[in-house]
Amino acid sequence: MRHSRILADVGAALRFYSRIPVPAGAAEDAFAPPDLKRIAYAVPLAGAAIGLAGAAILIGAHALGLPNLVAAILAVLTCVLLTGALHEDGLADTADGFGGGASRLRRLEIMRDSRIGSYGACALVFSLLLRVALLDGLLALSPTRAALALIAAASLSRAAGMLLLEFLPPARADGASAAAGQPGADAAVRSALVGALLATLLIVPSTGVGATLMAIGLSVLALFAMTRLSNRLIGGQTGDVAGAVQQLCEIAFLMGVLIYARPH
């Protein structure tokens, strides 16, 4: 595969999953849903780019002598700003729908409501607190480990979202997920392999095989738990659920690394 094609696909993934102003090619529609079959493998690469920006802020803030907690907050804030809180919005909508709806149709209706409810607010708070706390804990052990873990988590968690979109059919016919379509089994597997490979290359040298297996294993558990829950409650997936999967898998990955990185 040519480098220009890879860069174009990563650019398409960044345009869709972030606020980074990546220009579209002459033959591309910058406002159309991406071709997931084509760019699925590039989604974890785009995630790594977003994580890299957060990691740079993390290392920079730590090098300036700021407290670990402040550095962790700035790193998470950077990732949130770069994505326009896309995944956080999905997590909040999913929590509101799954927690507040008594029927499939009511859950989907709540998930489309732009207002945030108590379940969504709690989910957002816990997501932000957990990511900040986990990065703070990793920073206390090693800034390098913390930075690499953030990049790997941002990459693998977005590959998990691709797997969800393939595992389940769209829950509604007129949502963003239905418009983008399913990536297809081959494309979803390629996305997962790229995410897992990046995570392995980043975490094994810095923290070890055990940390890598634990982090990936917890991410897989989070993915399958959300897949089963989404299928049971709404009969499929939506873009919001994919965002929730990204958030939960990122938390699970960071937690797995910290479990093995801390002194025993």
Curated annotation (Swiss-Prot):
Q: Which residues cross the membrane?
A: 39-59, 63-83, 121-141, 148-168, 201-221, 241-261
| Cofactors demanded by this protein | Mg(2+)
The answer to keyword Isomerase applying to this record is no
Question: An example of a Gene Ontology BP annotation on this entry?
Answer: cobalamin biosynthetic process
**Which pathway?**
Cofactor biosynthesis; adenosylcobalamin biosynthesis; adenosylcobalamin from cob(II)yrinate a,c-diamide: step 7/7
Q: Which superkingdom, per the lineage?
A: Bacteria
Keyword Cell membrane among UniProt keywords: yes
Q: Which GO terms describe its molecular function?
A: adenosylcobinamide-GDP ribazoletransferase activity; cobalamin 5'-phosphate synthase activity
Alphabetical keyword list: Cell inner membrane, Cell membrane, Cobalamin biosynthesis, Magnesium, Membrane, Transferase, Transmembrane, Transmembrane helix
Task: Name the family.
Answer: Belongs to the CobS family.
Query: This chain belongs to which protein, by name?
Result: Adenosylcobinamide-GDP ribazoletransferase
What gene name is given for the protein in this entry? cobS
